[in-house]
């Protein structure tokens, strides 16, 4: 059984993150020398696995560069020199870190602050990012003027300004560096079909869930092709899904909340599945580990 200090958050602030169930996923995966996180995304499972003591090496693969951003966070190489970002700067930015931190719901598409409170929030952030006391004091004066202007107009910004989500995201990134992971991290950027998994490794796959849309895959993920791939490979793949992939069987499940959009959530059953032809060997391995 995995024993580790419970964390508040794992991985990058990332839309679709497995942060809330990362410990459950890692606890259900068989211990091994190497774990491959095939659709790593925001690297919540990667991060949790690195801290779990179950693996000596974790390979985070994705078609995006998010695992590279996570690796930078692990190594303390996060560059905040361009922060904070205004709405116009966000629109022009192609930097993954900036677009994650300054997007609503970390979707990299929509700017995090509404137009009505952008001036106040950006001024508040500049008070924190200022390199010198003079810089921070100048930002403080701008913040006070902006806040006073809103209050004079009768705007109620107390609740909206009390949380600077971008600052919270940066604090989360910096906390990753302070976690002292036990496992070695490697990153890869390729399609899951092109990844060459090390022999004998534990392979975990968290593809976009069947029926969902995701921008990294041109608006849609070819789930039939993924199921065909599962049928062809000569190693077990542990798949997170709400529904059982073709040719697979369930090895674990739990209820969780799914955010259907940025405001509503529904209760769903999250399952962990493996190809049926590997089920007996996987379960035998679990019994041997007990």
Residue locations for each model-derived region?
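Short glycine/proline-enriched coil/turn segments at helix->beta-strand junctions
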Residues: 29-34, 54-55, 75-76, 91-94, ...
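Acidic, His/Gly-enriched loop-helix segments that form or flank divalent-metal centers
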Residues: 153-231
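S-adenosyl-L-methionine
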Residues: 1-51
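Long, positively charged, glycine-interspersed low-complexity recognition regions
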Residues: 4, 210, 216-290
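A conditional alpha-helix N-cap/helix-loop micro-motif detector
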Residues: 14-18, 90, 219
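Conserved proline-anchored active-site loop of SAM-dependent methyltransferases
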Residues: 25, 35-49, 60-64, 97, ...
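Class I S-adenosyl-L-methionine-dependent methyltransferase module
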Residues: 52, 56-183
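Short, glycine/charged-enriched secondary-structure capping and boundary segments
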Residues: 51-54, 73-76, 217-220, 252-254
């Amino acid at each position: 059984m995995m024993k580790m200090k419970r964390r508040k958050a794992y991985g990058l602030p990332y839309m679709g993150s497995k942060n809330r169930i990362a410990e459950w996923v890692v606890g259900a995966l068989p211990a091994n020398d190497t774990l491959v996180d095939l659709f790593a995304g925001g690297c919540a499972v990667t991060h949790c696995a690195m801290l779990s003591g179950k693996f000596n090496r974790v390979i985070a693969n994705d078609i995006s560069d998010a695992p590279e951003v996570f690796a930078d966070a692990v190594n303390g190489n996060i560059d905040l020199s361009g922060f904070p970002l205004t709405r116009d700067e966000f629109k022009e930015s192609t930097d993954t870190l900036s677009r994650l931190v300054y997007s609503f719901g970390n979707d990299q598409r929509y700017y995090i602050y509404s137009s009505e409170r952008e001036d106040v929030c950006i001024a508040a952030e500049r008070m924190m990012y200022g390199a010198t006391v003079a810089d921070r004091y100048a930002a403080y004066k701008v913040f006070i003027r902006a806040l006073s202007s809103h209050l004079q107009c009768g705007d109620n910004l107390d609740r909206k300004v009390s949380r600077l989500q971008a600052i919270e995201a940066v604090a989360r990134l910096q906390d990753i560096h302070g976690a002292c992971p036990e496992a070695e991290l490697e990153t890869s950027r390729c399609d899951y079909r092109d990844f060459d998994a090390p022999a004998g490794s534990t392979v975990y796959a968290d593809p976009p869930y069947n029926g969902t849309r995701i921008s990294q895959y041109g608006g849609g993920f070819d789930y039939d092709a993924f199921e065909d791939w599962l049928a062809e490979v000569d190693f077990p793949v542990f798949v997170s899904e709400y529904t059982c992939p073709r040719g697979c069987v369930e090895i674990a499940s739990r209820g969780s909340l799914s955010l259907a959009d940025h405001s509503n959530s529904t209760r769903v059953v999250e399952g962990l599945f493996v190809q049926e032809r590997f089920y007996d060997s996987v379960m035998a391995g679990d019994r041997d580990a007990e």
